[in-house]
Structure formats: C-alpha cells, structure tokens
Amino acid sequence: MKLSEQWLREWVNPPVDTEKLTAQLTMAGLEVDSVKPAARTLEKVVVGEVIAREKHPDADRLSVCRVDVGEDEPLEIVCGAPNVRTGLKVAVVLVGGVVGDLKVKKTKLRGVVSNGMICSEREMGLSEQHEGIMELPADAPIGKNIQEYLTLDDYILDIELTPNRGDCASVRGIAREVGAINRLPIKGPNLVTVSATINDVFPVEVKAEKACPRYIGRVIRGVDSHSQTPLWICERLRRSGLRTIHPVVDVMNYVMLELGQPLHAFDLSRLVEGIEVRFAKADEKITLIDETEIALTERMLVIADKSRPQALAGIMGGANSAVNEKTEAIFLESAYFSPGEIALTARHYDMQTDSSYRFERGVDFKLQTLAMERATELLIQITGGSPGPLIEVCSETHLPKIPRIILRPERIKRLLGIEINEDEVSKLLELLGMRVVKEKNNWVVTVPSHRFDIKEEADLIEELAHLYGYDRIPQLRMEGEYTIAPFSETQLSSARLRCLMTDRGYHEAVTYSFVNDELQTLLNPEVTSIALSNPLTAEMNVMRTSLWPGLIQVLKYNQARQTHRIRLFEIGMCFNAAGNEWQQVTKLGGLVAGDAHSLQWAEKGRRVDFYDVKGDLSALFTLTRTEAHFRFAEGHHPALHPGQSAALYYKDQCIGYLGALHPELVDQLELTAAPFLFEMELNAIKTSILPKYHPLSKFPSIRRDIAIVVDRDVPVGNIEEEIKSTAGQLLIITQVFDIYESGKHIEFGKKSVALGLTFQDPSRTLIDGEVKQIIERVLAALERKFNAKLRA
C-alpha cells in the first residue's frame, strides 16, 4: 500500500524524521518496502500559462508557444506535446532550471529558440504519464513555484501489509499504529453527519445476508459530473498509485484510501426499480467497467437491480451503471462483505482490485456509515447535489462477533520473559483502541471492531511487545527444565515408516491442512468439516478430515504435466468435528496411479492394481511384528469403488480404508485413470513388539495342500483365520496358492480355494497320523462355518 507521508502526518505527526518513522512501522510489523520522493529534483520550475500557440514553421509535430510565467515578458518555448493549447496552465522549467538529472538551457529547435521547457508528469517524476504535458488546474497561480504549489516536499511510503493486517490498508489505519507507537492521539478530518435535503430513497433487498451482513445506500441528485476534482485529492490519489477518473469516482477512491472502506457509485438513471444483493443466477453475464465480459456462476456474489447484475460485489462495478460525464443522480454503496466470498470470486476470475484487496483481508464492520457520510460530505463540496436519507439493511446475527479476551500477567512473562507494570499494560492496550477492565489478577480486553486479527491471548501479548518496544526487552539466558522423553523400543518412529514407504517406491508429499470444502464433501458427504473463519483463499476454506483431497490435487497437478506413474504417501494431521469439539488425528495416507513398474524391456507393462497396494500395506504391517492382528475385510467408503475396496482392521477396530477411487469421482475430477488410495490412523501401526529368540526347529516340516469349494462371496481371509484357530500351534505357514472361480467341476456361484498348510514341531518329528487328524479337524470346521466341501 502506498501513501503520502504528508497525508499521514495530518492524522498524526510524531517528532521523528522519515527514516525513524519507517523504522517504527517496520518494527510494528508493517514493513516499509520503499521510501521514494514525491517528485524528482526540481529547480526553477514554475506555473505558467500558454497565451499563444502557433505551428512550428519547419516541423509538423512541434508548436511554438508564448508562455506567461509571471515575468515582464512571456517566454517563447518550443513544445512537441499534442495537448498543448492556448489558455492551458502548465509546469515550466526556466532556463538554468533542473528536472531530475536534466539542466535546461536555451536551445534552438529547427531554427526557433526555446527559452525553457514545458514538462510532462513523467519528466517531473510524478507518474508514468508521458503522452502529453501536465495540465494544471485553471486557478493555478502563474509564477508559483511548482514544488510549493503541488506540495512536492513529500515522500511516498510503500508498505507491505501482511494478510492479517487489513485494518492498516488506509491512512487512518496506519495513523492508529503510528499514534500508538509514539503515544499520540490521531486527529484526521472532522467527520460530520450530512443531513438529508431530499426524501428520495431507492429500495434495497439483501438476499445473501451471510455474504453481506450490512449494506448502506444513499441517493444523491443534482451531481455536476463536469466539476473538477480538487488538486489536493488528485495529488493524494496519485501518490497512492491511483489516477483521477471522474469526480465521483475520485471521491470514492479517496475515502477508501483515507478510511479503508471501499465504496461504489452507480448511475441512478441506469438502475431498475431497486438494488438486490444476491448470488448470481445460472447463465448470467456482466460486462465490467474495464469492458471485460464474464460469465457468472451461482457461487458469485453480485449487486443487481431488477433486470440484471450491475456489479461484481466488492470487486468491480459494471459498465452499464458506471458514472460518466452525463451522470446527474447517483446511488452510493457502502457495504460489509464476507472476506471469504470476495476472495472466492476474485480467485475465480483472477482479479485483484483495490476494493477486493481490502475486502479479502477484512474491513471494519462498523465503518460503513462513517465512510458514507465522509463521501457524501466531499461529493457535495466538489460536485454539488442533494443527498437523500441513509438506507441501511443489516443482519446483526451474521456480523463478526467482537471477542473478549482474558489476559494473564503470568502468560505475558512466559511469552516475553519480562514483567510489565500493570498500569502500563492497560495504557498500551488502550492506545490500540481496546477496552481494558481489571478483574482480580487478570485483564478482560474487548477488541475494537477494526482489529479482526486479534482473537486470543497470544495476539494481545504480541501487540504489547511491539508497543513496549523490542529494544526494551533484555537479552536473558534461557532457563527451564527439559525432561527427556522416555524412549520405548516398542514404538515405531515415523522416520522408520517413511523409510519403508520410500523403499517401496513412494515419494513423500506434504500438502496443506486447509482444503476445498467442495472437494472434501465430494469424497465423503458424511463428514463434518471445520470451517475457517478467515481462510487464506476461497479454495482452502476448511480443515482437512482426510489426506486424500490434498493427494488428489497433487495427482491432478502432475497429470496435467504429463506425469502419469505416481506413488505418493503423506503423514499428517487431520481434523474431525465431534459436536462442539474437534479432534486431531495423525494419519498415514497414500495414492498410487499409473503403471505398476517403470517401463523396461524385459517385462510387459501393466497397470497398478488393488493387490499391488495391498502388498505395500502388508509390508507396513510386518514392521509391527503383529501382522497377524491386521486384516483386510469388506468395508464401504463413499469415495471408493465398491468392488475394489477394503476396510483395514487391527484386531476388531477399523483403522482405515484401501481401494480404487469411485468411477463417478474419476469423471467429476477429470482424472485420466482411477488411482488407488489408502489411509489409516498412524497410532494403529506405531506400536511394535520386541522380537523374541526362537531356535530354528531341527525337525522336518510337513506340507499338506487342500482345495475347498465355497460360495463365491466368502472372503478368503475368513477362511485363513478359521484354519489358523482350528489347527493350533503346529501350523506355522498358511499360503493361498490358487483361486478358481469358473470352469469345469465348479458350480455357478462357487469358487475353489487351494491352500498350502505347513506343520512343524520344534521338539520332535511329526507323523502323518497327527497331521491327518489336524487336516480332518480343519475341514470339519470349514464345513460347519462356510459349508465348504473338499474338492475332488
């Protein structure tokens, strides 16, 4: 944000120079990116009036001008600007004068002597405007030093605001900070309430109260659109990086820079029946004041009349109702819009205006009436006109709530390492406009409406620190007790899990904890998301409940760049709402897409399948040395393909899911192929058991193969569990080596499962009879539970 130092000092004028002032702002967290003079070096530059203009006798593009600069005789000056004309007030550099690095001398141009130079804004360092010479107001005093006339003994401060300090996007906001730092009150203009002189009102209906909790309007008739914007407003706009457009628009911009409240003016004659603040309808379009036509979606907030959208709320007005030189009646708008709604629209259309810049960061929700009165006052002074009464529509329930925060002295000492006198704490906070009440040993602080970045105790302590002065905080040796956390050999570290995943060809991803609500709901409509009150962007408006939204976004990013074989994993926190509480759960998730292996000459390529990913998870479970307690079972997740998914269980607890992304979601997300996803609670796989020594058996093992026929829908995992529980400790290995579902000798709806069972006793040699008895018990158990038949 750019602003004039002179303008700032009208609000608060601390006894410090420019260098000290910028240092104070930077230490307060408002980093001053640059400090530049308001103009280049100017010597012997005065106001002049062109009293005669003739065409140069030997050059079509040059003019010979006689210019009155307040001396005995007019000067003859050769000028090449297309806008030079008789009666124009201009900036003239006299012979011997200096503009920047240029010293002006008497010169002969195509045979005509030029006794000076008429300047453009660019030559004087005022702006990049160079199409013609600078045109001064008609009442500019001839012979007046231009530096004094334009008050150019000034500096332009360019302040880099962080997203949380939207309250400082105005001269008033910066003045509040400077005043607090220097213990000075701020002055500013005398803001008055303008009485209505006509009874004209224009109907306003707010249909989107959550997106626009407060809307104030006013009709002003009899506006003179040909009036001249005062030079002091023009200069302040220029030094803030804005150009003059129209007296009404200039006043809107000036009040925005002064107070921080964006305003908009509609040509009242172009509005039909009334104002509606609503979301756009399907297939609606709007042509903006920059002549850009955009197609609106139903998520976009607009200001409309009864016929069409007339403005993109909080961002830019429409061309249809823009004020122009024929405008005689206007409807002024001063509103509070939800930061998230404005951010959503601005990001969607890749637009950032001075208005959206402020609304996205947050505007004081109590400022709208004040800004309306200030704009009305200036408009009547400059353009004339008769104002009507204020029209206000407000939904108090949807306005931001002002927090009351308890501040504890012990917390101040813990965070800053010092004790601050109780009276000083109260005074410092009151300098920031806060209401402070002492209750017992604590302070109860009510935050002003413009400080929407202060939400908790730590925020107050941060404000105390920069007002108290970081240079007053002594350097102390850190003291404290550090207890070494006990290390358990049964705890698997996250680093070990990461190593295994990378060993199996995965790349670790780190995605944002903030995700898009629409994508998260698409993947799991049953989940309740935690909404952010002030999201960084409209696409990151809720806390994630799963790692999958972030991983899918990474997949889309890579597929758009022709990378199709992707193996990703992530370990991160997820946040689940549970009533009025919320829970943090650390999860391990992954995504696999594309070919199972990199292309090679010795093996034909194939797509990754369910069992590839299942094998990776089985390897992960093996790390715990309790892999027998993990199982893959039937389970439903709305994001996964019902025929290619499974629930992950540890003992009897569901810890996650694995499967292919649902085909409908693949289409909606415009993915090239369905990826496989998995996710589980990290704590379920972080506990291992200590290995115990078991000597290898000296005695031979016996393997018996069996093939049973069961119903097709019987899970093989259930069969394995039943075999293990029935066979006892002599069974050391169970291996499925064949599944046959169709063909000769197999009934429809049945399948054949072949298993290899290996038996061994560590203390003796088993005999066939013992193994035969175990096999018979196993077959009997399988028949009872699954109606399994031994295949002939």
Curated annotation (Swiss-Prot):
Q: Where is the tRNA-binding domain?
A: 39-147
State its location(s). Answer: Cytoplasm
Q: Which Pfam families match?
A: B3_4, B5, FDX-ACB, tRNA_bind, tRNA_synthFbeta
Q: Example GO biological process term? A: phenylalanyl-tRNA aminoacylation
What main location does UniProt list? cytoplasm
Question: Could you tell me which SUPFAM superfamilies the record lists for this protein?
Answer: Anticodon-binding domain of PheRS, Class II aaRS and biotin synthetases, Nucleic acid-binding proteins, PheT/TilS domain, Putative DNA-binding domain
The record's catalysed reaction(s) read: tRNA(Phe) + L-phenylalanine + ATP = L-phenylalanyl-tRNA(Phe) + AMP + diphosphate + H(+)
> Does this entry carry the keyword Protein biosynthesis?
yes
Q: Which gene encodes it?
A: pheT
The residues the record assigns to binding Mg(2+) are 453, 459, 462-463
Keywords assigned by UniProt, alphabetized? Aminoacyl-tRNA synthetase, ATP-binding, Cytoplasm, Ligase, Magnesium, Metal-binding, Nucleotide-binding, Protein biosynthesis, RNA-binding, tRNA-binding
Q: Show the GO cellular component annotation of the record.
A: phenylalanine-tRNA ligase complex
Asked whether the UniProt record includes DNA-binding among its keywords, one would answer no
Output the InterPro entries linked to this UniProt entry. aa-tRNA-synth_II/BPL/LPL, B3/B4_tRNA-bd, DNA-bd_dom_put_sf, Fdx_antiC-bd, Fdx_antiC-bd_sf, NA-bd_OB-fold, Phe-tRNA-ligase_IIc_bsu, Phe-tRNA-ligase_IIc_bsu_bact
Q: Which CDD domains match?
A: PheRS_beta_core (cd00769), tRNA_bind_bactPheRS (cd02796)
Provide the E.C. number(s) assigned to this enzyme: 6.1.1.20
List the protein's name. Answer: Phenylalanine--tRNA ligase beta subunit
Q: List the cofactors.
A: Mg(2+)
